[in-house]
């Protein structure tokens, strides 16, 4: 996975998330939407709609009180916790 900041200001961040697919992007987007201060989260990886873009572009918008980079860090941490919880539960079940 490679990340490249496309655009950033106090309340919005757009980054390219190279090497990822819909599965990962949907999980990350869903967790971002549950994150305090995030007002919108979306991604685009459709070349026809994004001028030939083939890698996912993630856009995060916040209420302005939360830095979008901080929101992304929080969402990444929460996603990691969810995956660890699933792994622990699965391990106990089998």
Curated annotation (Swiss-Prot):
Give UniProt keywords alphabetically. Cytoplasm, DNA-directed RNA polymerase, Nucleotidyltransferase, Transcription, Transferase
Which cellular component, as a GO term, is one annotated location? cytoplasm
Q: Record's InterPro entries?
A: RBP11-like, RBP11-like_dimer, RNA_pol_Rpb11_13-16kDa_CS, Rpo11-like
Q: Which GO terms describe its biological process?
A: DNA-templated transcription
Location, primary (coarse class): cytoplasm
Q: Spell out the reaction equation it catalyses.
A: RNA(n) + a ribonucleoside 5'-triphosphate = RNA(n+1) + diphosphate
Concerning CDD domains, the annotation shows: RNAP_L
Q: What are the protein's GO molecular function terms?
A: DNA binding; DNA-directed RNA polymerase activity; protein dimerization activity
Enzyme class label: transferase
Function, as annotated, reads: DNA-dependent RNA polymerase (RNAP) catalyzes the transcription of DNA into RNA using the four ribonucleoside triphosphates as substrates.
Q: Which family does it belong to?
A: Belongs to the archaeal Rpo11/eukaryotic RPB11/RPC19 RNA polymerase subunit family.
List the NCBIfam families: PRK01146.1-5
Protein name from the UniProt record: DNA-directed RNA polymerase subunit Rpo11
Q: Which organism is it from?
A: Halobacterium salinarum (strain ATCC 700922 / JCM 11081 / NRC-1) (Halobacterium halobium)
- Which gene is this protein's source? rpo11
